[in-house]
Amino acid sequence: IGGGFGLSLPTEPMIWLLYIYYGYYLLVSGKINIEFIKIPLVAAILINFGWMFITVCTSTMFFTSLKYFLARSWFMVIFFFFLFKIFQNPLFIRRFFSYLLYGSTIVVFYTLVKHYGEDFSRGWGYMIMRPFFSDHTIYAAYIAFFVPVAVMFTLRGNFFNFSVFHRLVFAVISLVLIAGVIFSYTRAAWISLLAAIAFYFLIKLKVKFKSILIALSAVAIGFFIYQDKILYSLEANKKGSADDLEAHAQSVSNITTDPSNLERMNRWNCAMMMFREKPVFGFGPGTYTFKYAPYQNSKDLTLISTNSGDLGNTHSEYFNSLSEMGLIGLLSWVSVFLCSIALGLQIVYEEKREAWQRSVTTALLLGLVTYYVHAFLNNYSDFDKIAAPLWGFMAIMVAIKFYWKYPEVKVK
């Protein structure tokens, strides 16, 4: 709904009702098990949420930040804590995946058919998924979450008692979802799927989390040390966005002439300047869109730059947290991502666990990795369509860890 309401129908009213119901259930039943807080991922989520509340109190736009905080609390309570409770029955894990896969496939197939009628042109690819998704990038980010799940059901469907026919259906679903990502013309989603494939091989090699963390730290340090040389090399790429998929892929690193990439750099520069001004608490959750305009440098402005804040946000989860919640906000948000990876790897590498649990967790990890990589270039965690798989995938991993130490549970 437009007109300033900013309401997404029918999902947000449904989330509100579930939020009220779950709160009432907890108050009446008194069944609050706080033991799962000992799991590092849960602790990291609560710390991030707690710091967000502090930055609401120090916000430069208190009511805007309060509204943002409440919206995030709805998503977290329903898609993480409520689903965590539901997922103690493993049957609901299969249903969660199946229903979302079937529904997503219908939307993607419908979008592809419409796009086919326009010769799969890039221009139409940016809006063809409406009214289901407002933007091609959030559409692609959502689909990328479920590609590993569809592939897992295809290859490991026997662990879930799926028939050969059902596994063939999931194979078709996998192809449809991959086609959806490709013809979304979303370069960040393409990169995220490649990153998920690379991460899968790390899992197969049983690379430990500490080794991955050290490697990521080395890459980050190397970038800051050699950033001038890296940027100079990237400036040599003049390939612009194009209908041709290969040329469009080559434009990923074009920071000289590609408007989308240039505007992304502009938004990041604004976020850094905002961080330097308020490094501890930031400007407040949900305020970047309204505050970044004065920090734009004239030399960074592009054809799609705006002062009205109506064309996207920070274009990065990480820069967004940095500008809105300061350094602690960024570190706490990154800690959530890292703790989820650590928990996932721990489950996958536990040989005493049943095969279906390791397979599910592998798919969850790969799905989350697609978003963590995509999050460098876009930020959608405050959208319900992304919040559902983001928090839902984490909830499943925590449920597997908490409810089934050395499980004998079967998925039927």
Tell where the protein language model's regions lie, with residue ranges:
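A membrane-periplasm/extracellular boundary helix in multi-pass inner-membrane enzymes
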Residues: 115, 183, 204-259, 267-277, ...
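A juxtamembrane structural motif centered on a specific transmembrane helix
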Residues: 157, 346-362, 372-379, 390-412
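Selective detector of the "anchor" transmembrane alpha-helix that sits immediately C-terminal
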Residues: 324-346, 394
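Alpha-helical transmembrane segments of multi-pass inner-membrane proteins
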Residues: 15, 19, 49-57, 74-78, ...
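Membrane-interface helix caps and helix-loop-helix hairpins in membrane proteins
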Residues: 58-67, 182-183, 376-381
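Long extracytoplasmic/lumenal interhelical loops at the membrane interface
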Residues: 121-125, 255-269, 281-325
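Membrane-interface micro-motifs in multi-pass membrane enzymes
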Residues: 5-14, 68-72, 132-146, 188, ...
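Transmembrane signal-anchor hairpin modules in multi-pass inner-membrane enzymes, especially those
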Residues: 1-53, 63-64, 88-98, 153-169, ...
